[in-house]
Amino acid sequence: MTDDQAKQVLHRYLRSAREALLWKLDGLSEYDARRPLTPTGTNLLGLVKHVAGVSSEYFGSVFERPFPETLPWIGEGAEENAHLWVTAEESREDIVGLYQRVADHADATIEALDLDSPGIVPWWRKSGRGDVTLQQILVHMVAELHRHAGHADIVREQIDATTGLYASGSNLPDHDAEWWAAYRARIEEAAQTFQGR
């Protein structure tokens, strides 16, 4: 595999993860898109906002190709965890639009650079990993995006039982709600044998 082919493969996985995360918002009310469903506040629109923010940095300033918009929830002086939730003043359209503009900016960076193009991640410097290549950042961001797409899978299922990798079809076996309830009951029964251990 050539470097160009490897870059295309990594880029395809990145785009796939972007799509998987974004479709989890489809058909949801503003409330359901924003509401926290874990003790630490994980919410679908916040995940999209977070990914937009980190992508703007990793495919922007890291390679001296800064994203042209200022994101007040990123960087020095930003409110802690402000990148993980959406305020009442921020609309879904604002966040999704930003996500798409950041993706376009990232795509332009990926297309313009070679896999061995150097970059610097200032916030990684303390750990001695600050000097990076586009390949390292692509791998990092593929992992980051797929991780958050997995979070979104679970959050969306908690909201309305919607599952699957893509809007075009589920990657789960095709069974009705009754089958899934019985399946879940079997898992719970097996787990109960270890309750208190």
What are these regions (language model features)?
Residues 1-6:
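Short, contiguous pre-domain boundary segments
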Residues 79-136:
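A contiguous binding-surface segment within folded domains or other stable secondary-structure elements
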